[in-house]
UniProtKB/Swiss-Prot annotation:
This is Adenylyl cyclase-associated protein 1. There is a cross-link at residue 347 (Glycyl lysine isopeptide (Lys-Gly) (interchain with G-Cter in SUMO1)). The modification Phosphoserine is found at residues 34, 289, 294, 300, 307, 309. The gene is Cap1. Keywords: Acetylation, Actin-binding, Cell membrane, Isopeptide bond, Membrane, Methylation, Phosphoprotein, Ubl conjugation. It is found in: Cell membrane. It comes from Mus musculus (Mouse). The modification Phosphotyrosine is found at residue 31. Residues 217-227 have a biased composition (Low complexity). SMART domains: CARP (SM00673). It is a peripheral membrane protein. GO terms for biological process: actin cytoskeleton organization; ameboidal-type cell migration; cell morphogenesis; modification of postsynaptic actin cytoskeleton; receptor-mediated endocytosis.
């Protein structure tokens, strides 16, 4: 219920922002100015994008329902906020510096809402759908780029495809609406790329005339419900600077420079220090001297007297090892060395998340295994008919006893993959990872270790780019 309440509150805040956007007056030239029917072509083109691929994405998300639909509503809010910014840019000149950041803040906040939703729903059966959206929603930030935003959107689209490919693999022969959902979602970003190329090739096209867009409050000119109290009145002016102090400092500096300008003759005023005047030669001087005086402390602004508030203890998530539908969830296990899953079926998958210093054995034949955000994990399994994926992890060791067609390593530092004799034809697919090693069994029962290449060389051969592994001589 608490999660549902949080979701409702987030949606209410987003709706409030949109309502405020639609009511802001023209004289403020604010973020939410609604253009007239005669909107500039690039606003009309964005409306077309909302009415076609975005509408289809919302329709398919509603058919799937659940977390996918909730996520889509958040994405839709972000796109409508972006549309409001485009309408403002078509009527106003670009503000400078912090003022522009204020205009972009609602979009940035909505992007973070979308990402946070995925993080809070890692146990969702639609986790791959949520991840595809979460990894690519930052494409809405193209409006903040000063040059060539199109390639940035393409990069975000490619990030989404890493997860949409999983959705296709899981649902292609099971439920066609998930395939249509993937097609609709990716088309948003491909059409946005074409839109940017046509209207905003070198960045968001602001109006050359009209007033400068002012600081975005996202609120009507009058007070609104939920607005904070007025700011406190300014404090008293600072006391006048003492002129005598300034003259004293000036005189001191003049005297100092006069001494420096003496050059080597300044040493003539120095007095010889005999041994009986040195504390390390005459211990009696130490007893006579008082406490050592420290030099003047550098100036620091006075700090307000506030009582330190204790930091809230980090909430530790409960450890899980359970079968939820067709998914084995192994989460938040720490310092456990005897975890075993032995009642497996071919259609089941395993999702291993945030396990630290833990060993897990999966017996029997299973569809796929995903290792996400784990450290010092040891995984032993018999047979996997699909893929074993290691993501966002560190120091992971996996060993196949039977057969596996593919092992994918992504954003991982330190991964050892021990293959069996029956899995020597396994494909190792890696990206953004380091310290990867594949261990091949020998006749004597030992393993030979082979590092996976991490450094490459790319050349243009006149027609295409050719990439080869770079051999580094030891």
């Amino acid at each position: 219920m608490a999660d549902m309440q949080n979701l409702v509150e987030r949606l209410e805040r987003a709706v409030g922002r949109l309502e405020a956007v639609s009511h802001t007056s023209d004289m403020h030239c604010g973020y939410g100015d609604s253009p007239s029917k005669g909107a500039v072509p690039y606003v009309q083109a964005f409306d077309s994008l909302l009415a076609n691929p975005v509408a289809e994405y919302l329709k398919m998300s509603k058919e799937i329902g659940g977390d996918v639909q909730k996520h889509a509503e958040m994405v839709h809010t972000g796109l409508k906020l972006e549309r409001a910014l485009l309408a403002t840019a078509s009527q106003c000149q670009q503000p400078a510096g912090n003022k522009l950041s204020d205009l972009l803040a609602p979009i940035s906040e909505q992007i973070q809402e979308v990402i946070t939703f995925r993080e809070k729903n890692r146990g969702s059966k639609f986790f791959n759908h949520l991840s595809a959206v979460s990894e690519s929603i930052q494409a809405l930030g193209w409006v903040a780029l000063a040059a060539k935003p199109g390639p940035f959107v393409k990069e975000m689209n490619d990030a989404a495809m890493f997860y949409t490919n999983r959705v296709l693999k899981e649902y292609r022969d099971v439920d066609k609406k998930h395939v249509d959902w993937v097609r609709a979602y990716l088309s948003i970003w491909t059409e946005l790329q074409a839109y940017i190329k046509e209207f905003h090739t070198t960045g968001l096209a602001w109006s050359k005339t009209g007033p400068v867009a002012k600081e975005l409050s996202g609120l009507p000119s009058g007070p609104s419900v939920g607005s904070g109290p007025p700011p406190p009145p300014p404090g008293p002016p600072p006391p006048p600077i003492s002129t005598s102090s300034g003259s004293d400092d000036s005189a001191s500096r003049s005297a100092l420079f006069a001494q420096i300008n003496q050059g080597e003759s300044i040493t003539h005023a120095l007095k010889h220090v005999s041994d009986d005047m040195k504390t390390h030669k005459n211990p009696a001087l130490k007893a006579q001297s008082g406490p050592v005086r420290s030099g003047p402390k550098p100036f620091s602004a006075p700090k307000p007297q506030t009582s330190p508030s204790p930091k809230p203890a980090t909430k530790k998530e409960p450890a899980l090892l359970e079968l939820e539908g067709k998914k084995w969830r192994v989460e938040n296990q720490e310092n456990v060395s005897n975890l075993v899953i032995d009642d497996t079926e071919l259609k089941q998958v395993a999702y291993i998340y945030k396990c630290v210093n833990t060993t897990l054995q999966i017996k029997g034949k299973i569809n796929s295994i995903t290792v996400d955000n784990c450290k010092k994990l040891g995984l032993v399994f018999d047979d996997v008919v699909g893929i074993v994926e290691i993501i966002n992890s560190r120091d992971v060791k996996v060993q196949v006893m039977g057969k596996v067609p593919t092992i994918s390593i992504n954003k991982t530092d330190g991964c050892h993959a021990y293959l069996s004799k029956n899995s020597l034809d396994c494909e190792i697919v890696s990206a953004k990872s380091s310290e990867m090693n594949v261990l091949i069994p020998t006749e004597g029962g030992d393993f030979n270790e082979f590092p996976v290449p991490e450094q490459f060389k790319t050349l243009w051969n006149g027609q295409k780019l050719v990439t080869t592994v770079t051999e580094i001589a030891g």
